[in-house]
From Swiss-Prot:
Keywords: Cytoplasm, Methyltransferase, rRNA processing, S-adenosyl-L-methionine, Transferase. The lineage of its organism: Bacteria, Pseudomonadati, Pseudomonadota, Gammaproteobacteria, Alteromonadales. GO terms for cellular component: cytoplasm. GO terms for molecular function: rRNA (pseudouridine-N3-)-methyltransferase activity. Transmembrane segments: none annotated. Homodimer. Specifically methylates the pseudouridine at position 1915 (m3Psi1915) in 23S rRNA. Its EC number is 2.1.1.177. It comes from Shewanella sp. (strain ANA-3). It comes from the Bacteria. This is Ribosomal RNA large subunit methyltransferase H. Belongs to the RNA methyltransferase RlmH family.
Length: 156
């Protein structure tokens, strides 16, 4: 199974790139974690946010290979504990499909992305900066993988 993190925003600070890559490289080849960056729409004083969200959403959906299981990261989503995320990851593997996880921009996800989702995950009730979300998601997925494989990374 492949995991695909599709996130709005490019040109992240080095600490974000290094943090994400640290967890990305830990995954085994049979569960690769890929990052796809979607350019953020230009925001300004008179920006048409609805149009920007729509365009970002179209680009995100276009980046998802046909047949992937889609999970949005969104406040109304499910709050998973590590064991619950590990269980969800097991189900994804048994389903036999790759997984695309969608992280929106400053205004969140386009309605079309939310409608296309099979699941929604609330990473935190806190508002987190989007660059940090990439690292937290990568670490959380790696930790869930470690639970499923009895790897010593996760300790109860």
């Amino acid at each position: 199974m492949k995991l695909q993190l599709i996130a709005v925003g490019t040109r992240m600070p080095d600490w974000v790139t290094r943090g994400f890559e640290e967890y990305q490289r830990r995954f085994p080849r049979d569960m690769a974690l890929e990052l796809i960056e979607i350019p953020a729409g230009k925001r300004g004083k008179n920006a048409d946010i609805v149009r920007i969200l729509q365009k970002e959403g179209e680009q995100m959906l276009a980046a998802i290979p046909k047949g992937n299981h889609i999970v949005t990261l969104d406040l109304p989503g499910k709050n998973w504990t590590t064991p619950e995320l590990a269980t969800a990851m097991n189900k994804w593997q048994l389903d036999g499909r790759d997984v695309s996880l969608l992280v929106g921009g400053p205004e969140g996800l386009a309605p079309a992305c939310k409608e296309a989702a099979h699941q929604s995950w609330c990473l935190s009730a806190l508002t987190l900066p989007h660059p940090l979300v990439r690292i937290v998601v990568a670490e959380s997925l790696y930790r869930a993988w470690s639970v499923n494989t009895n790897h010593p990374y996760h300790r109860e």
